[in-house]
Each structure stands twice: as structure tokens, then as C-alpha cells.
């Protein structure tokens, strides 16, 4: 495994009261679009905040390089099924935060 893996953490702050709608939208449209378009292989997982800041949907992606990451997002943003989903998701979000992280050269990796 490459010790220089790049992880991208995307945190979406969901409008209060809208999390059930966001989860349903991801389940019925977002995830199927990711799988059908062949985009799901980079996904480590989706998470919903339980303590600390609430109303957050967090997803983590793993890439071998920044070039691979940029190609992935470029391809995803050209996927019409995913973009139809994204257009419905955006009004339910308050803000988005993206953090890029490099894997440490020791310890377990997802």
C-alpha cells in the first residue's frame, strides 16, 4: 500500500431538520448514481455526526495522488445522473468543508 495515499474528507453541514431528506436523497439517487457511474471505488465511507457539531454528513475518499483526485472529481461532475442528484442536494446544505490529508507512514489504513 502506498504510504502517500491522499484522503479527502468532505463535511456537509445540513440545514436543521433536513437530515432525513438528505439521507433519503443519497440513498435513492446519490449512491445509485455513484455506483452506476463507476465512481464508488474511491469511497472509504459515509458518516453522520453523532456528537460534537450535529447535522453533518461526512464522507471520506481515498486517492493515490492529487492528479487521480482531480480526475475523479472532474469525471464525477460530468456525470448527468450525479449532477441531477447534486442539484437537489445543494439547497439542503448550509456549507461544505473539504480537508485533504496524507496517510501517516505507520499504522492501519482503511
Residue ranges of model-derived segments:
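Glycine-rich beta-strand-turn "strand-cap" elements at beta-sheet edges
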Residues: 1-4, 40-58, 81-110
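Short amphipathic alpha-helical segments
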Residues: 18-43, 76-77
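Generic "edge-of-domain/loop-turn" microfeature
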Residues: 19, 68, 105-107
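Short, well-ordered beta-strand segments in beta-rich or mixed alpha/beta enzyme
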Residues: 6-13, 45-77
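N-terminal short leaders/motifs
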Residues: 1, 10-17
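Short, solvent-exposed alpha-helical surface patches in well-structured domains
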Residues: 21, 68-71, 84
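Non-catalytic surface loops within mature trypsin-like serine protease
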Residues: 16, 63-65, 102-104
Amino acid at each position: 500500500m502506498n504510504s502517500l495515499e491522499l484522503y479527502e474528507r468532505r463535511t456537509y453541514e445540513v440545514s436543521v431538520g433536513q437530515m432525513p431528506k438528505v439521507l433519503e436523497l443519497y440513498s435513492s439517487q446519490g449512491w445509485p448514481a455513484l455506483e452506476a457511474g463507476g465512481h464508488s471505488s474511491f469511497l472509504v465511507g459515509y458518516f453522520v455526526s453523532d456528537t460534537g457539531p450535529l447535522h453533518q454528513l461526512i464522507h471520506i475518499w481515498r486517492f493515490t495522488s492529487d492528479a487521480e483526485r482531480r480526475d475523479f472529481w472532474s469525471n464525477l461532475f460530468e456525470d448527468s445522473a450525479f449532477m441531477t442528484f447534486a442539484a437537489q442536494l445543494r439547497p439542503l446544505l448550509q456549507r461544505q468543508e473539504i480537508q485533504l490529508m496524507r496517510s501517516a507512514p505507520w499504522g492501519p489504513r482503511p
